[in-house]
């Protein structure tokens, strides 16, 4: 649980990301950046955010097919039903139960609204943002779908998670395209997930060989 207050401000990091054009063709990040940096613009009556994560990794080695060049690799998260529909159904049910318990109104979001799920989840104690900028959980690694429930009532905060990365650089070292330009800084225009999902144009020749047989997304980091 995270309290919405003036200290819940992600504007500096977001502005830097956008100014460097590290978001590439994801113009939707610019259009509602004010909502991302201030959750109350999204809903001015919101007082607390309940953040949630659901593990989506199954028993498989997500990198085992990299050497089999006659096969295309699809990111683990998209090998099942659309997670938006599954999580929204769960969120709706949970939100109604919370509203009855706390006598409050609510709005719930999963990935499609301008909510900074990762830093909010860190403040809410689910995990910490690793050097690859993904959220890392002690129990589930980076294999989490994140969602949130906004409520118009103050709830006691949970303890924020701290950064446990230390001197580890595994995520940086494993990135095929060097998209993690420095610890905690991602250039999405070099990221294979961006290039194979969000990018609609021609992929730079220098990046094509590095992408290998990944045809939709990337799970390396």
Segments (PLM) and residue ranges:
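A short, flexible beta-alpha/helix-coil linker loop
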Residues: 156, 197-198
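Processing junctions and N-termini across compartments
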Residues: 159-165, 185, 212
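A broad, structural surface signal
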Residues: 48, 89-100, 169-173, 209, ...
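Iron-sulfur cluster-binding cysteine motifs and their immediate structural context
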Residues: 170-194, 200, 211-221
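Short linker/helix segments within small regulatory modules
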Residues: 203-209
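Auxiliary alpha/beta "docking" domains used to position bulky ligands
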Residues: 1-164, 203
